[in-house]
Regions:
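Short, solvent-exposed secondary-structure junction/capping segments
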Residues: 12-16, 30-44
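Hydrophobic pocket/interface hotspot
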Residues: 14, 26-27, 34, 52, ...
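A beta-strand edge to alpha-helix "cap/lid" segment located at domain peripheries
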Residues: 1, 44, 57-117
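Short, hydrophobic secondary-structure boundary micro-motifs
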Residues: 27, 37-38, 72-73
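Generic alpha-helical structural signal
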Residues: 8, 12, 54-61
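Short, low-complexity N-terminal intrinsically disordered segments enriched in polar/charged residues
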Residues: 1-28
């Protein structure tokens, strides 16, 4: 499949995994050595940089518990070289851009979330 088809499939599955609130399904997309940057992480765990799959599981597990009505609506996606950006709206109506970098096996090794005001 071409990069655009792969990016579209990833974006749709990623949003579906979040909307299912399935932490294992969400984390299956990420490499063990993931580095994740998010202003929300800074609020929830005191650090905007989350390193490693265990730390990411702990953070997102806590975040899911804090947001029982969490729901993402996919707006669009952009494909790049071993990278993509997912643009979505969260359950609070806030727009979020999640940019990810993939390794050669298609796992996310670096991700950053940027939020609209």
């Amino acid at each position: 499949a071409d990069a655009f088809a792969q990016a579209e499939a990833f974006a749709q599955e990623w949003v579906a995994a979040w909307n299912a609130r399935d932490l294992d399904r969400i984390l299956a997309h990420y490499d063990d050595d993931i580095v994740f940057l998010s202003p929300n992480a800074a609020q929830v765990i005191g650090d905007g940089r989350v390193e490693g799959i265990a730390a990411l599981r702990a953070y997102w597990g806590q975040a899911l518990d804090m947001a029982p009505h969490l729901h993402f609506t996919l707006e669009t996606w952009l494909a790049g070289h071993q990278a993509m950006t997912i643009l979505y709206a969260n359950h609070r109506g806030q727009r979020v851009a999640e940019s990810v970098e993939f390794d050669s096996k298609g796992k996310v090794v670096r991700s950053m979330a940027c939020h609209a005001p």
